[in-house]
Amino acid sequence: INITDAHITNPKENYIIYSIAKAGLSTLTKSLAKELGPKIRVNAVAPGPILWPEKSNGFDENYRKKVISQTMLKKVGEADDIAKAVEFLLLNAPFITSHTLAVDGGRSFSSD
């Protein structure tokens, strides 16, 4: 299970290197699934707005509210949401491979 980012299809401004790395990891996920299948499944989880450290993230409260307003579930996720997605792909998804699972409260479905 690789951890990518919800912005792999719509990169954020000023995050060029990060975006390149995460997009590459997404392609690696698909390539490895093709190379290692059928014996090994390879998937990725793409976190969206996950609970940020309150004072250390560089985002002001207005930006945080904007992000939440663009999320269908109207909240940020928690690290446990990512862990549960990884667990699902490992233990309960034997017929899923080469997939990137967005764990973003529906934000990737909304427009930025």
Summary of predicted features, one role per range:
Residues 4-10, 32, 107:
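Active-site segment of SDR-like NAD(P)-dependent oxidoreductases
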Residues 33-38:
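Alpha-helical segment proximal to the catalytic Tyr-Lys
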Residues 75-103, 108:
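C-terminal substrate-recognition "lid" of short-chain dehydrogenase/reductases
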Residues 1-6, 45-47:
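SDR active-site strand-loop-helix element
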